[in-house]
Amino acid sequence: MAAPALLLLALLLPVGAWPGLPRRPCVHCCRPAWPPGPYARVSDRDLWRGDLWRGLPRVRPTIDIEILKGEKGEAGVRGRAGRSGKEGPPGARGLQGRRGQKGQVGPPGAACRRAYAAFSVGRREGLHSSDHFQAVPFDTELVNLDGAFDLAAGRFLCTVPGVYFLSLNVHTWNYKETYLHIMLNRRPAAVLYAQPSERSVMQAQSLMLLLAAGDAVWVRMFQRDRDNAIYGEHGDLYITFSGHLVKPAAEL
């Protein structure tokens, strides 16, 4: 009987007749309280206006930009190169680098060509001077590299410049003077001389000359008041003229 009476009383009383009673939101049995967190006391006026959520924290929705970001587009056309800037001052000298590794052995070079020049000629027939000057010709070729010596003219023409050793050997004639010059072009370089004597002897002269390409070396017989001659026999070789390159000019 008491329960129906209380229900009837609650329906008949106006809103706000129970000011002392706190108002709480509905709580479900299987869910957490709603709205969550602390809440403010709701007045009868707010409840009458229907503003049940007054005093509760506001929920502001946010949008994640990363979700809305699209895919990366294609690269654009390369722009023009900008103007070159002014040249800056030189930087400080850097540290010395490490020593590199030893390189590979290179290919073998061409073989070195060594220069040679030599001649050795003789005369078997004796010769008397009749002119003021007379070149001594030769009739026997012993050594004549590259044909540089002309037997008929009695001249050696230098083709390999350098230092040469030259020697002249003759046999004097009894009671006759022997007077010869070793000539370099038109200049006497050395003399070979023997006075008249009742006995014939071997006479020699040697020297070294620096020859250039095109220089000529030859033997000249000189005529004076007395008869000038050199002795020779076909069976023996008494008169010889020789020369060879000691050192080429390229190595001087």
Curated annotation (Swiss-Prot):
Residues 69-111 form the Collagen-like domain. InterPro entries: C1q_dom (IPR001073), Cerebellin_Synaptic_Org (IPR050822), Collagen (IPR008160), Tumour_necrosis_fac-like_dom (IPR008983). Residues 1-17 form the signal peptide. It is found in: Secreted. It holds the Pfam family C1q. Keywords: Collagen, Secreted, Signal. Residues 74-109 are annotated as: Disordered. May play a role as ligand of RXFP1. Expressed predominantly in lung and testis. Expressed in astrocytes. GO terms for cellular component: collagen trimer; extracellular space. Residues 112-252 form the C1q domain. One of its GO terms (biological process) is positive regulation of cell motility. SUPFAM superfamilies: TNF-like. Gene3D superfamilies: 2.60.120.40. Homotrimer. Forms heteromeric complexes with C1QL1. Interacts with RXFP1. It comes from the Eukaryota. This is Complement C1q tumor necrosis factor-related protein 8. Not N-glycosylated.
